[in-house]
Amino acid sequence: MAKAATPKKTAAVNGAGKVTQVIGAVVDVAFEGELPPILNALETQNNGNRLVLEVAQHLGENVVRTIAMDSTEGLVRGQSVADTGAPIEVPVGLETLGRIMNVIGEPVDEAGPIVTAKKRAIHQDAPSYVEQSTEGQILVTGIKVVDLLAPYAKGGKIGLFGGAGVGKTVLIMELINNVAKAHGGYSVFAGVGERTREGNDLYHEMIESNVNKLGGGEGSKAALVYGQMNEPPGARARVALTGLTIAENFRDEGQDVLFFVDNIFRFTQAGSEVSALLGRIPSAVGYQPTLATDMGQMQERITTTNKGSITSVQAIYVPADDLTDPAPATSFAHLDATTVLSRSIAEKGIYPAVDPLDSTSRMLDPMIVGEEHYEVARKVQSTLQRYKSLQDIIAILGMDELSEEDKLTVARARKIERFLSQPFFVAEVFTGSPGKLVALEDTIKGFKGLVNGEYDSLPEAAFYMVGSMEEAIEKAKKLTAEAA
């Protein structure tokens, strides 16, 4: 029986389907023989280009409903369609580093084909319980404010919140750079439904700041996968999975991988467009009824296994600043940490502009990070919180009206604020200051001394844009010498 079934499948592969209906990104295909399974990739030609369709529904009477991964303009009824016999497969491996590809794994950076030893289907099962590693470990980023106050979990998920122009891209590039330096790990960046211009800028900035090499190859640290705003919903709904598949391959080879998604909201938005086109009845606020399932299936694949880890940083757009909107609310359920970038901090010239009071992490637990780290982090936060509550009094009455204790708190808080800044490797090109990667022990030691008053005698300026406390002390000596 099994042998008799084989020719049928070959017939399907050789193109036994025909287009019967095209409505936007949804294409119905009728097959004479065996129907392709759900999620299989079908191929047809459109205006001389390869058009990939993904099977979404079986409608009966040998018709399948598919989602197009590219524009369907120019597609006609009766056109022949071939079943590839497998889901969408994309190239994976070291050859993808430094390159940009689209949802179906085709290069879009005009640097020639991506030739890899193997390909991998974009739909994979999440690792089983046996494969998963449950040990709580911190991923040290070398960025003081992150490591001290909102540490990232290895294999965890981090939400990155911030408006336009507060330094999201620079922070992302620094994380890519530091993970490559400190852990020898690679990164994958999935541009989901964002501006093509920003994607292009990121690509060129990565080359300028030596994160990637032009045309890929030796020395490149990140693979880029784009499905931007101008693309059909099918591509935007699947491009995060394409990026995740490349990251999973690196993880299975024993790497600690960073996986960036910009923007996770667009993944949900594309899913809701596809859902409406497939004729599903919408759920709350017009989102797809399968919102939680779609999000869960993707997020559960991002995890630490016995082989390696995928740590995911996801930029999250909050529509109309409504945190109760189903799309961001569903994302929050999966997050281990949040990094909030604040415009008010960026306005002070403090970069990275991470808000030390708004950013949170479930890893900041004495059982995980240790008693000393936890105590120092909480003292830093309480000092900053006290300073924040005194700012109104300072604005109205001035510093002189404060008690001696409050004056000391304000002085320390201002030093802490400045010490939370640090020069980035990827910004060297623009600032001229060499970047600093700070070890966690040095970060804890420095801030412990600050909150305990060991450095009360040093001027504020000494703490601005330095790495470790030793550098701040050196800078203070220089400033004193210059003043003299």
From Swiss-Prot:
Instruction: Please report a single Pfam family linked to this protein.
Output: ATP-synt_ab
What is this enzyme's catalytic activity, as reactions?
Answer: ATP + H2O + 4 H(+)(in) = ADP + phosphate + 5 H(+)(out)
Q: SMART domains, per this entry?
A: AAA
Asked if the record carries the keyword Acetylation, the reply is no
What's its membrane topology? Answer: Peripheral membrane protein
- What enzyme class is recorded for this protein? translocase
**Record-listed E.C. numbers:** 7.1.2.2
Gene Ontology cellular component terms for the protein in this record: plasma membrane; proton-transporting ATP synthase complex
> PROSITE patterns annotated for this entry?
ATPASE_ALPHA_BETA
TM region(s), chain numbering? none
| InterPro entries xrefs | AAA+_ATPase (IPR003593), ATP-synt_VA_C (IPR055190), ATP_synth_F1_bsu (IPR005722), ATPase_a/bsu_AS (IPR020003), ATPase_alpha/beta_chains (IPR050053), ATPase_F1/V1/A1_a/bsu_N (IPR004100), ATPase_F1/V1/A1_a/bsu_N_sf (IPR036121), ATPase_F1/V1/A1_a/bsu_nucl-bd (IPR000194)
Task: State a single Gene Ontology molecular function.
Answer: proton-transporting ATP synthase activity, rotational mechanism
- Tell me, what does this protein do in biology? Produces ATP from ADP in the presence of a proton gradient across the membrane. The catalytic sites are hosted primarily by the beta subunits.
Q: How does it assemble?
A: F-type ATPases have 2 components, CF(1) - the catalytic core - and CF(0) - the membrane proton channel. CF(1) has five subunits: alpha(3), beta(3), gamma(1), delta(1), epsilon(1). CF(0) has three main subunits: a(1), b(2) and c(9-12). The alpha and beta chains form an alternating ring which encloses part of the gamma chain. CF(1) is attached to CF(0) by a central stalk formed by the gamma and epsilon chains, while a peripheral stalk is formed by the delta and b chains.
Q: What is this protein called?
A: ATP synthase subunit beta
What organism is the protein native to?
Answer: Agrobacterium fabrum (strain C58 / ATCC 33970) (Agrobacterium tumefaciens (strain C58))
For this protein's source organism, the top of the classification is: Bacteria, Pseudomonadati, Pseudomonadota, Alphaproteobacteria, Hyphomicrobiales
Q: Which gene encodes it?
A: atpD
